[in-house]
Amino acid sequence: MLTIFIVTATLFAILYFYFTRNFNYWKDRNVVGPEPTVFFGNIMESVIRRKHLIMIYKDIYEAFPKEKVVGIYRMTTPCLLLRDLDVIKHVMIKDFDLFNDRGVEFSEEGLGLNIFHADGDRWRVLRQCFTPLFTSGKLKNMLNLMSDRGDKFIKMVEKFCDKEPEQQIIPLVRKFTMASITTCAFGMELDEEMIETLDKLDSLIFTTSYGNEIDMMYPGILKKLNSSIFSKMIAPFFDNLTKTIIEQRGGKPTNRKDLMDLILELRQKKAIEPMKKTHDEQVTTLELTDSVIAAQTFIFYAAGYETSASTMSFLLFELAENPDIQEKVIAEVDETLKRHNGEITYDTLSEMTYLTQVFHETLRKYPVADILLRNAKADYAVPGTNVTLKKGQTVVVSGFGIHYDPKYYPDPEKFDPERFSPENVRNRHPCAYIPFGAGQRKCLGMRFGQWQVQVCIIKLLSKFRFEPSTKTMSEFNYDPKRLLVYPKSGIFLNIIPRNY
């Protein structure tokens, strides 16, 4: 009995030491931060899926208002949360060559070689290749596709609202984003079978994976094990879909001018060239194989589907809660569409300046894809501090923390589109608003995402007004099991046909 006790006690002591071995790292360097919990570090509530990781980082940000940086532990791994905007600007922009890798490494197989997750030279080659596909000139051709899907969506909404004015908004607008993304990316018309398949993929793509926590504890292990954070069911779907579409088009672009057309046109021109060396990186080239194309179409779908649907839902919620703002947007929509004969074009969107301000204020309050991570590629003296990051360590930036900081946004809980008037934007620090990231790794598809949201909102407000319902919540708790910001209770609103 005594022997069992001694062995058990020894085992617990060893495990305790192992899982706390790094927890004096920041204290030894005089960097303040919250006390870590054994095994979990500072993210226990996220690991047990009690609280969204985004809100944990926001709480840490707010707990240390006088600090430029805060020492934290993602599981047992020391990381640095950045609070000071000038420090963030250095890391994300000025010293980007030392921080061009994201915080999670995993296998390039199974869609891992997408532009969002790719690191090093592979990311540089992909960025050089795909950036020209997301210019205003290229995306203008997709506006007609979005608008057409918007018209069909409105007819469906009319039928729903005839039966029941109160609607759960997120699943409703997802029907638009799913149709818009699939037609703009793949040129597909959705049938019931495809809709059912994509609905199943939604939970697989956007449900948090414990692979993230494993990589936090043992950085780089997923890559060493040739493993991914994505479900094994996702890659075959996008691989097969991409292969089928390419075969249907004979491997050549058509006249649709959707994303697949632009990629096939790029492949025909062989537009990928080697990059110059940066620091100790090796120059690489990258062939646009079907697998590489599948990885890009996957991330385009994943990034544009859920984020746009959530942003639209939060935007409509704020319009319902602020009817004076809603009426101002409706007036702008009506007047602008009248000038353009009801057509939604690039000029139409450009002239709806107040709607654009509402869009940005929505993402200020609800940055749906919030956390920014970067890995140091070499030892780095953090500007304005006595802190030195070691090569391979990760920095964390909390968009929620910054967006709710009264130093940058007085009365941050208030929904105020005037924060994004041209004058206010000019006077604000460039890193005080980061819903799409910052620097060269800023979201390539941000213009597409903004247009997709605006097109749908224009279509909806042309026909309806939105009001709170009996189920409308005034505050949101975010689902810790979802990868992005998603309200657990949903968003319910009454959709009321406009009386002209």
Swiss-Prot record:
Location (main, coarse): endoplasmic reticulum
Annotated function: Enables the insect to feed on furanocoumarin-producing plants and evolved as an adaptation for detoxification of xanthotoxin and other furanocoumarins. This isozyme metabolizes isopimpinellin, imperatorin, and bergapten at high rates, xanthotoxin and psoralen at intermediate rates and angelicin, sphondin, and trioxsalen only at very low rates.
Cellular component, GO annotation: endoplasmic reticulum membrane
InterPro entries: Cyt_P450, Cyt_P450_CS, Cyt_P450_E_grp-I, Cyt_P450_sf, Insect_CytP450_Detox
Name under which the protein is recorded: Cytochrome P450 6B4
Localization terms from the record: Endoplasmic reticulum membrane; Microsome membrane
Topology in membrane: Peripheral membrane protein
Keyword NADP: no
E.C. designation(s): 1.14.14.1
Gene: CYP6B4
Enzyme class: oxidoreductase
Family: Belongs to the cytochrome P450 family.
